[in-house]
Amino acid sequence: MTMPGARGWPKWFALAALVIVLDQISKLYFNSRFQYGEIRPVVEGFFNFTLVYNPGAAFSFLHDAGGWQKYLFTILAFAVSGWLGWNIVKRRFSGLMNLAAAFIMGGALGNVIDRLAYGHVIDFIMVHYYNEWYYPAFNLADSFICVGAALMVADSMKKPSR
């Protein structure tokens, strides 16, 4: 089914490219200005910048698997991005779903660049509650993937038009 409000697929690909550029610039910045493991508080007790490398996936899943996971996550990112891109081009998504897809594609491909270039993903954002609770470090690509996923959920909860 073709969605009437989903025209202009190049803008969604441009948005995905912008996400990749922002992600890569931020990673280059932190990788060049921080020592590995260095922590700089931004909001004391809640938010830090740091520099860590993640050879696995979210929450360091499979970080110690021996290297094959890099290829698995790369193939998965290309497959998902290809499927999302195809659906954007074929106008099968609503406008909100296109936005979500662009965010997910940009984030996934931003992390693929890291995996292929460095063998790991560069993370630098650390959210925590003093010394009691720490969320795993993440990056802009991860943030865009999460926002995209939330937008997909929101889009799926909309009532269908008659």
Swiss-Prot record:
Q: Look up and give the membrane topology term.
A: Multi-pass membrane protein
Q: Name one GO cellular component term.
A: plasma membrane
* Keyword Protease annotated: yes
Which catalysed reactions does the entry list for this protein? Release of signal peptides from bacterial membrane prolipoproteins. Hydrolyzes -Xaa-Yaa-Zaa-|-(S,diacylglyceryl)Cys-, in which Xaa is hydrophobic (preferably Leu), and Yaa (Ala or Ser) and Zaa (Gly or Ala) have small, neutral side chains
Known pathway = Protein modification; lipoprotein biosynthesis (signal peptide cleavage)
Sorted alphabetically, the Gene Ontology BP terms of this entry are: proteolysis
- UniProt xrefs under InterPro entries: Peptidase_A8
Which terms are listed as keywords in the entry? Aspartyl protease, Cell inner membrane, Cell membrane, Hydrolase, Membrane, Protease, Transmembrane, Transmembrane helix
Q: Which Pfam families match?
A: Peptidase_A8
Transmembrane region(s)? 12-32, 42-62, 66-86, 93-113, 133-153
Q: What is its EC number?
A: 3.4.23.36
Where in the cell is the protein located? Cell inner membrane
The positions flagged as active site in the entry are: D123, D142
| Source organism, top-level taxon | Bacteria
**First-level EC class:** hydrolase
Q: Function of this protein?
A: This protein specifically catalyzes the removal of signal peptides from prolipoproteins.
Protein family: Belongs to the peptidase A8 family.
Return the protein name: Lipoprotein signal peptidase
Species this protein is from: Chromobacterium violaceum (strain ATCC 12472 / DSM 30191 / JCM 1249 / CCUG 213 / NBRC 12614 / NCIMB 9131 / NCTC 9757 / MK)
